[in-house]
């Protein structure tokens, strides 16, 4: 199969040969959903904290005697039943949100994403992508000429100039093939891949 070559002026050129084993698979929506959710879960860190009945400020003094008052018995003011008491099952920063995805499933999901991008025409190939200096304007002008605003760039050689020039562009992410993640692939409107990176992607997902 072929992927369309995107020229510097935004016009589509001749096709670039690509492996149907990676870019010609059927779309498995359930599998793609699973690996995207797992990626987000594994990137999540615990940032919630609630106090249990040991951690809230309290006294161990019994509020009133056990019998004879007519009120329900109570042991101490930190009871979860009381206002200001501790939580029964409090949220903790040590919570583990990670989800395991087998390598075989992950690679199959990534192939499914790349194939769907190719079918939708959202993935294009460029000969190479570089800038002469680490200037945001230079890279922004290149993307403007190509008609791109939200783009994930997968390059075989992420040099310092290209990395620094892309950092300040809000809707641009430049990565190497091994760092392309499922969330970024489905998030950005367009995916731009250098010719050499196509071969690297095929090698990673074969």
Swiss-Prot record:
GO terms for molecular function: rRNA binding; structural constituent of ribosome. Residues 49-58 have a biased composition (Basic and acidic residues). Keywords: Ribonucleoprotein, Ribosomal protein, RNA-binding, rRNA-binding. GO terms for biological process: translation. Gene3D superfamilies: 3.40.1370.10. Residues 43-78 are annotated as: Disordered. The keyword Transferase does not apply. Residues 59-70 have a biased composition (Basic residues). It holds the Pfam family Ribosomal_L4. GO terms for cellular component: ribonucleoprotein complex; ribosome. The keyword Kinase does not apply. Belongs to the universal ribosomal protein uL4 family. NCBIfam families: rplD_bact (TIGR03953). HAMAP family: Ribosomal_uL4_B (MF_01328_B). One of the primary rRNA binding proteins, this protein initially binds near the 5'-end of the 23S rRNA. It is important during the early stages of 50S assembly. It makes multiple contacts with different domains of the 23S rRNA in the assembled 50S subunit and ribosome. This is Large ribosomal subunit protein uL4. It comes from Ralstonia nicotianae (strain ATCC BAA-1114 / GMI1000) (Ralstonia solanacearum).
């Amino acid at each position: 199969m072929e992927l369309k070559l995107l020229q510097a002026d935004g016009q589509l050129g001749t096709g670039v040969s690509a492996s149907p084993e990676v870019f010609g698979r059927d779309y498995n929506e359930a599998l793609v959903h699973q690996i995207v959710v797992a990626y987000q879960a594994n990137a999540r860190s615990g940032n919630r904290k609630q106090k249990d009945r040991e951690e809230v400020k309290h006294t161990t003094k019994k509020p009133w005697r056990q019998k004879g008052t007519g009120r329900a018995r109570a042991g101490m003011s930190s009871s979860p039943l009381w206002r200001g008491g501790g939580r029964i099952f409090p949220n903790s920063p040590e919570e583990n949100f990670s989800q395991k995805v087998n390598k075989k499933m992950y690679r199959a999901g990534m192939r499914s994403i790349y194939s769907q991008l190719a079918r939708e025409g959202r993935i294009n190939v460029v000969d190479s992508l570089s800038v002469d200096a680490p200037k945001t304007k230079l890279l922004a002008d290149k993307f403007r000429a190509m008609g791109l605003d939200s783009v994930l760039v997968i390059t075989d050689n992420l040099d310092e100039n290209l990395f620094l020039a892309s950092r300040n562009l809000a809707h641009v992410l430049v990565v190497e093939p091994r760092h392309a993640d499922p969330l970024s692939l489905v998030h950005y409107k367009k995916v731009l891949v250098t010719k050499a990176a196509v071969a690297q992607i095929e090698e990673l997902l074969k």
